[in-house]
């Protein structure tokens, strides 16, 4: 640890590190969203599907995020629960143009919310209704209705329409998540 790191820590200037789980079905845009939140010089040019999980980092104005980008492929979703205890917040990404798999996304969300490591914690959940740029995309209101988000009463949650490739809607979501993390004890 360098002198500046120590000094900033002593002065309370060092950013608080937060562990965030990034979940959602495969091809929903999880990795693209996390990549877009990193500084432009740290972004990957080629995004490939995540196998298992990867750890990514990005910073907001007051927090340092360590994101566990979890594979959304069916055979890897059982790995999600091994990281629930570590998570201080959740980003759940939905492909708003994939109407056929909205039921699967809803089932995975219910499984997540009912898991013992999540169920009794007031953990903030940010939903990105991604791929809003596509012609057949559902609105974030419709996605919210299909996933029955209004039934989530014991956790703060927010849904943002997003276009991960252009970066639209991402900052709004991160700002909300940052506010929640700073005000909610998980």
Curated annotation (Swiss-Prot):
Taxonomy, superkingdom: Eukaryota
InterPro entries with a match to the protein in the record: Arl6 (IPR041839), P-loop_NTPase (IPR027417), Small_GTP-bd (IPR005225), Small_GTPase_ARF (IPR024156), Small_GTPase_ARF/SAR (IPR006689)
Subcellular location: Cell projection, Cilium membrane; Cytoplasm, Cytoskeleton, Cilium axoneme; Cytoplasm, Cytoskeleton, Cilium basal body
Membrane topology: Peripheral membrane protein
Membrane spanning residue stretches: none
Family: Belongs to the small GTPase superfamily. Arf family.
Protein name listed in UniProt: ADP-ribosylation factor-like protein 6
């Amino acid at each position: 640890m360098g002198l500046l790191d120590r000094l900033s820590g002593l002065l309370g200037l060092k950013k608080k590190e937060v562990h965030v789980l990034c979940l959602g079905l495969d091809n929903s845009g999880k990795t693209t969203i996390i990549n877009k939140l990193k500084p432009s010089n740290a972004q990957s040019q080629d995004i490939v599907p995540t196998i298992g999980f990867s750890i990514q980092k990005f910073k907001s104005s007051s927090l340092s995020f360590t994101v566990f980008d979890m594979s959304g492929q069916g055979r890897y979703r059982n790995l999600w629960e091994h990281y629930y205890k570590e998570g201080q917040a959740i980003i759940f990404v939905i492909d708003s143009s994939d109407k056929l798999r909205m039921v699967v996304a809803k089932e995975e969300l219910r499984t997540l919310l009912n898991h013992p490591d999540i169920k009794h914690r007031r953990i903030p959940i940010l939903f990105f209704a991604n791929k809003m740029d596509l012609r057949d995309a559902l609105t974030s209101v419709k996605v919210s209705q299909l996933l029955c988000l209004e039934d989530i009463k014991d956790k703060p949650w927010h849904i943002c329409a997003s276009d991960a490739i252009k970066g639209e809607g991402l900052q709004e979501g991160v700002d909300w998540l940052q506010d929640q993390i700073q005000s909610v004890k998980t």
